[in-house]
A protein has these predicted regions:
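Single conserved hydrophobic/aromatic residue that forms the stacking wall/gate
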Residues: 1-7, 11-12
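Inter-helical turn/loop segments and adjacent helix faces that build the functional surface
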Residues: 15-16, 43-47, 69-107
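Active-site beta-strand/loop microenvironment that shapes enzyme catalytic pockets
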Residues: 16-54
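Post-HExxH zinc-binding segment in Zn-dependent metallohydrolases
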Residues: 48-74
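An amphipathic alpha-helical core segment
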Residues: 92-164
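Acidic, carboxylate-rich catalytic segments that either coordinate divalent cations
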Residues: 137-201
Length: 201
């Protein structure tokens, strides 16, 4: 990840675009959180306890409750700006991906995330289960697992507490790591080794 970010920050220095800087800092936040938490999430899934999707969904539910949001009414994609301006901005650091494809990805992300919200008592999930039943129960379950459900689908309190502690660990790292990115947007330099992971750690 690190070498690619250095090139992206050079692009920010050249263009002096605040929107591009905001995107890169957001990308950095995503990287810090995932590279810290995914090793544990993947370990739990590999042990057959709880799937990656289900654990993250229940963690989302917990965080929504903690921050005063209703998991059955909250739309996580509300902050995504699916505009051509956003797509052109992202294209500056991902030049191999066409602006149109980035725009479509943003639109589809927003649409599908809204579909997964349980604002209808689970009706969309049930309809999806029925529509996907010809594909087999296992494949249908893989897709419908993404839908938020009215109630928690599994008792994973121990795993959620561990994930919460890992998120706190990521939050502690974030200020220094994001400062590294911000400095690169002003002058050339190098990122520390902690940027040399993948999103899976």
């Amino acid at each position: 990840i690190g070498s690619g970010l250095v090139g992206s920050e050079m692009c920010i220095r050249d263009r002096k675009n605040p929107a591009l800087m905001a995107y890169m800092l957001g990308f950095g936040c995503h990287y810090i959180l995932d590279s810290t938490c995914h090793p544990y999430v993947n370990q739990v899934a590999a042990e057959g306890k709880i799937s990656h999707t289900l654990l993250e969904k229940e963690f989302d539910r917990m965080l929504m409750y903690e921050t005063g949001k209703n998991p059955l009414r909250f739309y996580p994609s509300h902050g995504i700006r699916a505009s051509f301006y956003s797509a052109r901005t992202i294209h500056q650091v991902l030049p191999l991906i066409r602006t149109w494809n980035i725009y479509l990805s943003l639109k589809m992300m927003k649409i599908f995330t809204c579909i997964l919200v349980c604002d209808d008592g689970g009706r969309k999930k049930r309809l999806s289960e029925h529509a996907l039943s010809p594909a087999g129960r296992k494949r249908a379950a893989f897709i419908t697992e993404f839908f938020m459900s009215p109630e928690p689908e599994v008792d994973c309190r121990k795993e959620l507490l561990k994930l919460d502690s890992l998120m706190e660990e990521a939050l502690e790292k974030a200020p220094d790591m994001l400062e590294e990115l911000a400095v690169l947007a002003v002058r050339p330099g190098h990122l520390s080794e902690r940027w040399n992971l993948t999103f899976n750690g």
